[in-house]
Amino acid sequence: MQYFDLMKKACDSVGMEFNEDKYQKFMLYKDLLKEWNEKINLTAITEDEEIVKKHFIDCIKAFKADEFKKAKTVIDVGTGAGFPGLPIAIMREDVEVTLLDSLNKRINFLNEVVNKLGLKNVKTIHSRAEDGARKKELRENFDIATSRAVANMCVLSEFCIPYVKVNGNFIALKGPNITEELNDSKNAIGTLGGKLKGITEVEIEGTDLNHNLVIVDKIKSTPKTFPRKAGNVTKKPLK
């Protein structure tokens, strides 16, 4: 129970319940992450305490956005090692979480975690973001699309906003310095049917890190021309 108090403090700060069952799931997730990381590249963060703070608590703090407390369906686009989707699924067993990633090795890891943790509310999809968003069963089908992927907001918006229902939200977990990036992305967000709702700053317990949750409202349907074909989204970001 070495990290229980630290994680509970983070949960308390965003109004989420934390208990021993959730803690044990996170610890098993941590062990599987370290084990698989020796076979495939999942994370550069490998120390137990750092995983707890910079992965788990960072994702738990996403619940500072009330939208995550109310949503019934969430898709994590470009989920990688499962962040923030798996922590959201552990914290809220009543929400349906879809984890989407383009690399099959990562999907195999995620399936193992889901099975070992006994998470009944998670499904995984092996797909590129821009391909998945063109599938009828995924497009404009989620209350929230989220991502902690390392890409600028113009790119992330085109990858994520098409998955969101009208009146839903795109929520990006971003680092500390985002003012210029957001100014550059406002037109792109609008083109895709979104409108910037606000930015929520979060402190990561046990560190001196401050991160930002960028919250976008989906106010109208995304034009059928988006997302563009593979490669164009990153090579020629929307302006």
Swiss-Prot record:
The UniProt entry, under CDD domains, shows: AdoMet_MTases
Give UniProt keywords alphabetically: Cytoplasm, Methyltransferase, rRNA processing, S-adenosyl-L-methionine, Transferase
- Which GO MF term does the entry hold, naming one? rRNA (guanine-N7-)-methyltransferase activity
Q: Which domain of life is it from?
A: Bacteria
Compartmental location: Cytoplasm
Instruction: Give the Pfam families listed for this entry.
Output: GidB (PF02527)
Which residues are recorded as binding S-adenosyl-L-methionine?
G78, F83, A129, E130, R148
- EC number, UniProt record: 2.1.1.-
Output the Gene Ontology cellular-component terms.
cytosol
Which HAMAP family does the annotation name? 16SrRNA_methyltr_G
Stated role: Specifically methylates the N7 position of a guanine in 16S rRNA.
User: How is this protein named in the record?
Assistant: Ribosomal RNA small subunit methyltransferase G
Q: Which organism is it from?
A: Clostridium perfringens (strain 13 / Type A)
Q: Gene encoding this chain?
A: rsmG
